[in-house]
Amino acid sequence: MSGFCVLGCGTMGKALLTGIFDSIAENGNDVSDEIIIPNKFYACVKFPKEKEDVQKLFGDRVKVVMGAKENAEMAAISNVLLLSCKPQAAEDVLNSPKMKEALKGKLILSILAGKTISSLQSMLDESTRVIRIMPNTASRIRESMSVICPGPNATEEDIKFAEWVFNGIGRSMKLPEKLIDAATAVCGSGPAFVATMIEAMTDGGVMMGIPFPQAQELAAQTMVGTGRMVLQGQHPAMIRNDVSTPAGCTISGLLALEDGKIRSTIARGIEQATKTASGLGK
């Protein structure tokens, strides 16, 4: 038996459980022998309304509990725990009675913003393994870009399991923890930056006579399609050059964007967001 427990089953916890169940339904046991697929699922919540919502969503596939005593009991019978409570509640959750003992030798997948591996490890037994992960808001539609940062005592099997879990809600990439602030800026804050670009393209279309709903769909699908071409191996510069014919409308528009310093403005936005992210955990 392999148990998977979600400590704090809010929006992200529910998205990850949904991804796990969908992955199991789609692929069954057709995964690497190094990955032990959970067959028991538990969710720990704080309020009755949360318990009702999780139970309604997953039915008898997930056992939902409330209270520190119950949290520790579920942790004790689980092999892997997803730490997805509010970051400021982490200390109370991990230092609650019997929890430290229950987590000995277990794997913790933490998605807590600003909580470093070392800060979490200081609250846990040295035998507890920690992997820090940063998913993004697109996890809601299983299109997340998640960054996986293994702790020093995480095993290869632990990392493969984390990748399996987070690939269920999109894509994942392993990076050292020292790069997580930059990754937070690119793919954590990135949806807000991309949404702003979609808004700007939409506004331009409306300005030139396209009704708003159609302009927004045109802009959004163009962003999605271009992203998929890049993910399939096409370099952004090649895509740009392929569309830019001599004396054409594309190169004319690109020059106007370059006049507005679009490249350096976006790059500086990433730089500033990285600096801000680095201060969140201090």
UniProtKB/Swiss-Prot annotation:
GO cellular component: cytosol
InterPro entries membership: 6-PGluconate_DH-like_C_sf, NAD(P)-bd_dom_sf, P5C_Rdtase_cat_N, P5CR-like_CS, P5CR_dimer, Pyrroline-COOH_reductase
This protein's pathway: Amino-acid biosynthesis; L-proline biosynthesis; L-proline from L-glutamate 5-semialdehyde: step 1/1
EC annotation from Swiss-Prot or TrEMBL: 1.5.1.2
Alphabetized GO MF terms: pyrroline-5-carboxylate reductase activity
Gene3D superfamilies assigned to the protein according to its UniProt record, in alphabetical order: NAD(P)-binding Rossmann-like Domain, ProC C-terminal domain-like
GO biological process: L-proline biosynthetic process
Keywords, sorted A to Z: Amino-acid biosynthesis, NADP, Oxidoreductase, Proline biosynthesis
Organism superkingdom: Eukaryota
Reaction(s) catalysed (UniProt annotation): L-proline + NADP(+) = (S)-1-pyrroline-5-carboxylate + NADPH + 2 H(+); L-proline + NAD(+) = (S)-1-pyrroline-5-carboxylate + NADH + 2 H(+)
Pfam families according to UniProt: F420_oxidored (PF03807), P5CR_dimer (PF14748)
Family membership noted in the UniProt record: Belongs to the pyrroline-5-carboxylate reductase family.
Protein name (record): Pyrroline-5-carboxylate reductase
Source organism (scientific name): Schizosaccharomyces pombe (strain 972 / ATCC 24843) (Fission yeast)
Gene behind the chain: pro3
